[in-house]
Each structure stands twice: as C-alpha cells, then as structure tokens.
C-alpha cells in the first residue's frame, strides 16, 4: 500500500494553480442524465470523478475523455440510458453516487440506488433526500440496502422545507425538480458555491431556476433539457488547504485560479490568525509575518466556515500562540485526525463536538494513518511544519479529492514523495 514520506521544515514559496471543484463536478456529471449530451471542462483528475464515470457508464452513458495536462474534458452522451440500478459495488466507494437518484427518477420514473458509502465521518443519512422526493409524489422503499424509487407519470412540483440544511439533499431535490411537472419551491436550502455552480449548469441546459445562491430556490419544471457545455468552478476546499499550508510552513504562496468571493471567509479567518492575505488577480497571496494567533472556529453551512477545512485549520492551530476552541456543527466523528495529531506532539482535548487546542512550539514527525480525505491532508500539513520525517499511511483517501498534491507542494519547495 502506498504512503507519503514528508521531510518538513521548509517554508513553501511559489504559486499553486487550483483544480476544478470535486463537489461541483460530481453533481454536474449526474445532471448529464437529464439531457442527451453534456460537455464538461475543468474536470479534476480524481478517483471520485472516475467512480462517477463508472457509475454513469453502468447506466448506459457513453463518455469520451479528453486529457489535458491539468484537467479532464468530458463529453457525456446519455441518450441510451438503459439501466436504472446503481449497484452497491460502485456506490459504496462514494456518497455522491446518490445524486443519480433524482435524475433517474424524474426522467425515467424509476431508480434503484444502493445506500451510499464514502468517508467514515458520521451517519450522513439519506432521510432528507427521500423526504423531498416523496413530497414530489415518488413512492420510495428501502429494501436490502437499496433505495427503490418510482413514480406513476412525472413527479410533481412541491413546496418543501428542509428541517436542516443539507447540501446533498438540496442537490438531489434540484436535479429532480428541473423535469418535474409544475413548480417546486425549496426552503432552507444549502447555499454553497457548488450548488450555485450546479444551478448555473442546469440553467445553461435550459432549466428554469430562481433564487440561486439563496436559501429559497424556485424551480419551474421543463419537459426536457438541452445539450450544453459547461466549465466547472475551481475548488475552494483545495484553495483553503494550500492557504493553510502556506501559513503552517511560514511561507509565501500565491493561490491562483480561484474566485476570491468563495474563499473570502477562509481569508478572513487567516487574517485573524495574523497572516497577511492579499487579493491578487485571479486568486490570493498568503504570507506568514512572524506570528500565529490562536483563533476559535465553528463549522457551519455556507457562508459559514466549511467542515471540509476544519481538520486543516486544526493542524494550523496546534502551533498557535494560545488556546483555540474548534466546534464541529456539521458532522459527528469528524475529529478522527486528533489522535494522529497528538502522536505528533499536538495538545488537543475533544469534548463532544468541541476540540480544545493548546498551541505548542513545534510538532514532531511520526508515522501516522489517515482516516478520511480531509484528515489525511491535515496530517500532511502537520508533517510539513516539522523539522523531521513524517510517514503517512492509507493515502488512497487523498486521491479522492486532491489532484497532483505532491507535485503542487513540491513545486513550492516541499520535500514530499509517494512510495
């Protein structure tokens, strides 16, 4: 099994280009089921993208892949969908597989999707996905680990209030509603940039969607959608991760190819810690200026601080000048990186959904193991900060969400290699 060997202590200096957003491209790929042809650019080279390609092909899609140095270009033809079951063997690899449920149901009146897998960071139930589709008139049963959904004729528009903000359920509801009969109004929706990107793609395909980027989205169903071409937005989680990498290594890095407004909350949090963060053309520049203040953090739905960056921020706070409180409001079990950080000398105490982080002068290299995607990269950041050697095991998680991570870090002076 592959591992990463990191020799830390080298400030990162240079520039990093940000790849397409994983959490945007996956629902956009699922949206291809709603039309006959979708051309997608700025597609990141990730195993989760490969899994979604495998899933769409299992449904009968024909996918042409054009490979460029820093991205994929996908041409997805879905005019011959002939299988309406998303099998366990594919779905177990990635939770995003559930996003074929809405498109298959709304276009073909039936879908059978295995209950999903993915990172082991909490229950992340599918109750809200099922509830909103039932409100649209679907008949849904859970049998033998599968969601069986069907409808007599087209599903119907509805008014639905999510009892809590759910990015995944918001996406499935939108994907279903664009071909539903009548008007759907969704309340308490996720407002994440990736949801906005999906809506913009659907609008380009001919969907009628209002309220994009707000908590109330109105969708007037269409009889069909058009072919389209769409460029996926850049990955704010990747951008934030490299911003923290610059900070934890006391470096100076330009993060390029990202819209500032979707990473502004990250930039403001770093400024609180004492970092210099300057908006530049097509990105930001993060510079360490000799201090690292301890700052409290709470994760919340967008525009709050992303749960997908909590672990990385915690790594940074292990080296801060005081005590910080990190509160995880989105997922349970998302402190699984804490024992590994403590193996490296961090002083962290977890109490329920809160972690108290007392800054130490320096972390020490160690052999550590990744439990999930974001935890794995937090341990890399910790390793980069040390003056010794860190070995990270179970790095297959990384390839699900970070394209060319070692190359991007090495180009800025990091000593990191995969063996």
UniProtKB/Swiss-Prot annotation:
GO biological process: cell division; cell wall organization; peptidoglycan biosynthetic process; regulation of cell shape; UDP-N-acetylgalactosamine biosynthetic process
Positions bearing 2-(S-cysteinyl)pyruvic acid O-phosphothioketal: 119
Any single Gene Ontology cellular-component annotation: cytoplasm
Positions of phosphoenolpyruvate binding: 22-23
Pfam families xrefs: EPSP_synthase (PF00275)
Pathway: Cell wall biogenesis; peptidoglycan biosynthesis
Active site (catalytic residues): 119 (proton donor)
Catalytic activity as recorded in UniProt: phosphoenolpyruvate + UDP-N-acetyl-alpha-D-glucosamine = UDP-N-acetyl-3-O-(1-carboxyvinyl)-alpha-D-glucosamine + phosphate
Entry's localization field: Cytoplasm
Molecular function (Gene Ontology), one example: UDP-N-acetylglucosamine 1-carboxyvinyltransferase activity
Binding site for UDP-N-acetyl-alpha-D-glucosamine: 95, 164-167, 308, 330
Keywords assigned: Cell cycle, Cell division, Cell shape, Cell wall biogenesis/degradation, Cytoplasm, Peptidoglycan synthesis, Pyruvate, Transferase
Enzyme class: transferase
Keyword Cell wall biogenesis/degradation: yes
Key word Coiled coil present: no
Disulfide cross-links: none
Biological role: Cell wall formation. Adds enolpyruvyl to UDP-N-acetylglucosamine.
UniProt similarity note: Belongs to the EPSP synthase family. MurA subfamily.
Name of protein: UDP-N-acetylglucosamine 1-carboxyvinyltransferase
Organism this protein belongs to: Rickettsia felis (strain ATCC VR-1525 / URRWXCal2)
